[in-house]
Design a protein with these regions (language model features):
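TRNA-recognition modules of translation machinery and tRNA-sensing kinases, especially anticodon-binding
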Residues: 27, 129-424
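N-terminal alpha-helical targeting/anchoring segments
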Residues: 1-135, 153, 157
């Protein structure tokens, strides 16, 4: 979340940034934050003054008694009792103001960087780069859901029977392809210096608040109400929360973690042709990169992550493009985000396969994730993460773009992992 210092020192800039993200009632909300913070500070000032007076009077009572000034001592005792009673009410008032302030800050998104373009939605995102060759497919090319059925790779109907829509069952070479991609992505991450983590796929509410999914995405997360636990939307949540309430040594940075997990999203309200097959699922596999770094290095770290994801797509021989997201299409927590999309020749559309984001200090402030400098000062870290990669649409693009009359060709980089060159 935003720090009070950010808001008080740069009020107008914060409001403009929130308006770039199309956050409703930005000015009114920030004014409410400032008002609540002033109330908390004023109450604290009165409480501190009262506590100081109590300490002073308490010291004087003994001396007054020694000097035989019993009436004055009694007056001082009565005043101390009055102040202590008043302080109880002041403490409750200050605690309530602090709670109100915290809850209010939880509802405010991160402020985008100046380099984020203006815009309302996906149509306003800026194409930064395109790469790979678009595949020329035969006129009778099939979408991936038809290919999955033809080669008995994925059974969507069986998933509906077992669980419901959006929970496919991978079979035979379909399951092998899925596992091959996971191992390929993890190996590539390790080669780039990432340490693999195998985290839980359920988290508590504190973890959800730490990375910013709560309260913003409450309705989009699967909630196990009996135990008050949430299924994770990506490994970002458990892996980043490893560093909640932690003060790191400057020498430990940057921290580079990767994790493969199953991910769960309710995707409430999603329907139509864009959600067919693997295009949008409730459960999917993903390899996530998480980095924690010093503020002055996070821009470079972000670029390294972008280069890593681009390298994966190049090795998979997929046509891709990189988008700089506009303010209105960015996530609640991101300060800067780039999306990677691969082209589906069979569907004639672009499919998102990764978002790589810099969160500045927004998550670190929620998490209280800090580092100690050489000068023994503690500073908030910068956090970054991105998918490298999300599997469903990668699988969809691989099946569609590599279909031939003989079968589906496997990219050379994957053959050592699949053990076969063709699905036929």
């Amino acid at each position: 979340m935003l720090t009070i210092k950010q808001i008080t020192d740069n009020t107008d800039a914060v409001i403009r940034g929130l308006e770039k993200k199309h956050f409703k009632n930005a000015k009114e909300t920030i004014e409410q934050v400032l008002e609540t913070n002033n109330k908390r500070r004023n109450t604290q000032t009165i409480l501190d003054k009262n506590l100081s007076e109590v300490n002073s009077l308490s010291k004087s009572i003994g001396m007054l008694m020694k000097e035989g000034k019993k009436d004055e001592a009694e007056t001082a005792k009565n005043r101390v009792a009055e102040l202590k009673e008043a302080n109880k009410a002041l403490q409750e008032e200050m605690d309530q103001a602090a709670t109100d302030l915290q809850n209010l800050l939880y509802t405010i998104p991160n402020v985008p960087y100046d380099s984020v373009p203006e815009g309302v939605g996906a149509d306003d995102n800026v194409v930064e780069k395109m790469g790979g060759m678009e595949t020329e497919l035969p006129k009778d090319a099939l979408p991936h859901w038809e290919l999955a059925k033809k080669y008995d790779l994925i059974d969507f109907d069986l998933g509906v029977k077992i669980t419901g829509a959006g929970f496919p069952v991978y079979k035979g070479k379909g399951a092998q392809l899925q596992r091959a991609l996971i191992n390929f992505f993890l190996d590539e991450a390790r080669k780039s210096g990432y340490t693999e983590i195998m985290p839980p796929t359920v988290v508590n509410a504190a973890s959800g608040y730490g990375t910013g999914q709560l309260p913003d995405k409450e309705g989009q997360m699967y909630h196990c109400e009996v135990d008050d636990l949430y299924l994770i939307p990506t490994a970002e949540v458990p892996v980043t929360n490893i560093y909640r309430d932690v003060i790191l040594d400057e020498k430990q940075l940057p921290i580079k973690n990767c994790a493969y997990t199953q991910c769960f999203r309710r995707e409430a309200g999603s329907y139509g042709k864009d959600v067919r097959g693997l295009n949008r699922l409730h459960e999917f596999s993903n390899v996530e990169l998480v980095r924690i770094d010093k503020p002055e290095h996070s821009k470079e770290s972000h670029q390294e992550m972008l280069n890593h994801v681009e390298g994966l797509l190049q090795k998979l021989e997929l046509p891709y493009r990189i988008l700089r997201l506009c303010g209105g299409d960015m996530s609640f927590t991101a300060a800067l985000c780039f999306d990677f999309e691969v082209y589906s020749e069979a569907q004639k559309r672009w499919l998102e396969v990764s978002s790589v984001s810099n969160f500045d200090t927004y998550q670190a402030n929620r998490l209280k994730c800090r580092y100690r400098t050489a000068e023994k000062k503690t500073e908030l870290c910068h956090t970054l993460n991105g998918s490298a990669l999300a599997l469903p649409r990668i699988v969809a693009a691989l099946l569609e773009n590599n279909q031939t009359p003989e079968g589906i060709r496997i990219p050379k980089a994957l053959v050592p992992y699949t053990g076969f060159e063709m699905i036929d």
